[in-house]
Amino acid sequence: MEKFCPTPLIKNNNDNFDLVENLNENDLLYSFGRLNVFHGQMGMFVRAMSYMLSHGADGLKQVSEDAVLNANYLRASLSSHLTPAFDGFCMHEILFSDDFLKDTGVETLDFAKAMIDEGYHPMTIYFPLVIHGALLVEPTETESKQSLDHFINTLCDLVERLKKDSDSFKAAPVFTPIRRLDETQAARKPVLRWKEEPLIAV
């Protein structure tokens, strides 16, 4: 895929390296030049192409079916503890509402933070916006039944714990180096570079 790489790129010319920017060079006939923001990242294209070529047509069909199967397995297994947003089968992701948290004092964010203490990165939360307190779970096609069952048991245990000790969810996560981050402030006032703190006069 080298001939399709966007510019600029670095070429090794024995003793030195050259920055290649000019599209008139023979080895850049297939390049479309600089990669603009909406085109994405070249590394992502390479990974996607590698994934597709390594699986082939039959393999892609199989992994797609596996992703849908895994999602529906989770949906069926979790529906007794969590509240599916819709009835019926789902595709590759399952959407839950926060109805199962009703009258517990725990919100979707608290539940997601508690998952961190259980060793799981939380699922997408509060999206889509049309579902109140949405939890969007997307199991990948590569998860084994054993790992799915472990995930199911963990979520069911968390829901059972809600009934006995909902206060612990407000403090979660407790096993991480940094506890609750203020995501809203981080999004509205991002710190994009490090500044050295002034020395304290003694």
Where would I find each of the regions flagged by the language model?
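Active-site PLP attachment segment
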Residues: M1-D18
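A generic, residue-level signal for flexible/boundary positions that often mark functional hotspots
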Residues: K3-F4, M49, L78
